[in-house]
Design a protein with these regions (language model features):
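A flexible loop/linker signature enriched in serine peptidases of the S9 family
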Residues: 61-74, 89-95, 110-120, 134-140, ...
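Short loop/turn segments that connect beta-strands within beta-propeller blades
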Residues: 79-83, 123-127, 201-205, 264-268
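Beta-strand-rich domains and repeat architectures in extracellular enzymes and scaffolds
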Residues: 37-73
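Hydrophobic beta-strand positions that form the internal "hydrophobic ladder"
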Residues: 54-57, 104-108, 151, 240, ...
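Blade/loop signatures of beta-propeller domains
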Residues: 15-33, 69, 194-195, 199-201, ...
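Residue-level detector of Asp-centered blade-edge/turn motifs that repeat once per structural unit
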Residues: 52-53, 102-103, 146-147, 235-236, ...
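Bacterial N-terminal signal peptides
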Residues: 1-8
């Protein structure tokens, strides 16, 4: 039996940019077949954050329009028990990456309202919106320190480790000179990579910060799916722990050995929390299975697998993260 699908879209609302909001669809299904149209009519929950007092949850929902071939990401706030979901987004601008300020009195989020992706904040009822970051590049992710005096910001930086830079006199050329592996993630060519920056917050505003991976051709968060879960602050707001696979080209393509690093904002020093200071990686033969490589048969635990998503314990004494035992796909 074929299902009958009826969609009644939410009434369009003009936003600040005079665009039309793609809102929640009212879905009526009869029958036993779930169709592609029904799937696209459903909202999809994305990122979320819990308030410091654990009483509220802010989260994103993306709604889709097959006719317009685009989506709209909005913010909702609800009680921690699931009651009273309230739509906070009232314009056609996409709003994402929500978080609570350290005091729990306001909500921060990313918006392109100013012409580029920047950090904004608003009251818990969605009013009193104002721009917080004024960076020269798009902000792709962020995380404020517990004391609210600093913020980690994610920006994309150019990279030429696997794809050569285009000639200046051929800016419209679509051709590429590929020199190594790791030149592509799924459908995306790797011409830029994410780096994390740390910036001061003064009078409720912030701007460009210091690149923690300055001059290094490595990613944080790691492509293609990494996000703000891959970096975190210590409770005293001094240290930053982050995930990084410090490899390029063929070595990156065949290895899953990422590590957890700790950056000291007071000294500017970085240390690897996964490897002993005297660690030297055994040579890997790309023609052989990783199962039988020397790196997976060391006489001590050097965290040679996929280490990611670090977080401090509430008292700041420990760092926990997710880890795989061995190197290799």
């Amino acid at each position: 039996m074929t299902a009958a699908l009826t969609l009644a879209s939410a009434s369009p609302v003009s936003g600040a940019n005079d665009g039309q909001i793609i809102g929640k669809n009212q879905i009526t299904l009869t029958g036993d077949r779930l169709t592609p149209e029904a799937l696209w009519a459903m909202g999809r929950i994305g990122t979320f954050a819990v308030s410091p007092d654990a009483q509220k949850i802010v989260y994103t929902v993306s709604y889709y329009s097959v006719q317009q071939n685009k989506s709209h990401t909005v913010l909702y706030l609800m009680d921690a028990n699931g009651a009273n979901p309230t739509l906070l987004t009232t314009t056609a601008d996409n709003e994402s990456e929500p978080a609570f300020t350290p005091d729990g009195q306001r909500i921060t989020f990313l918006s392109g309202k100013s012409g580029s992706s920047q950090i904004w904040e608003m009251a818990l009822d969605g009013t009193s919106r104002r721009q917080v970051s004024f960076c020269h590049k798009d902000v792709e992710g962020y995380k404020f320190s517990p004391d609210g005096k600093k913020v980690i910001i994610v920006h994309s930086v150019d990279t030429y480790t696997s794809i050569e830079k285009k000639y200046d006199d051929l800016p419209l050329s679509s051709g590429m000179v590929i020199t190594d592996l790791n030149y592509k993630h799924w459908d995306r060519y790797v011409t830029t990579i994410p780096h994390i920056f740390v910036a001061d917050v003064q009078d409720g505003r912030t701007g460009d910060g210091i690149d923690l991976l300055n001059g290094e051709p490595f990613e944080c968060p790691m492509l293609p799916f990494g996000g703000s879960e891959q970096f975190n602050w210590s409770p005293d707001s001094r240290h930053i722990v982050y995930t990084c696979r410090k490899k390029t080209g063929r070595d990156y393509a065949i290895s899953t050995d990422s590590d957890i690093y700790r950056y000291d904002t007071a000294t500017g020093q970085t240390e690897n929390l996964c490897k002993p200071a005297d660690y030297k990686e055994p040579e890997i033969d790309p023609s052989r299975s990783m199962e039988h490589q020397a790196i997976n048969h060391l006489d001590r635990d050097c965290n040679v697998g996929y280490d990611t998503n670090p977080a401090y314990s509430p008292d700041g004494k420990y760092v926990a993260w997710l880890s795989m035992a061995r190197n290799g796909y």
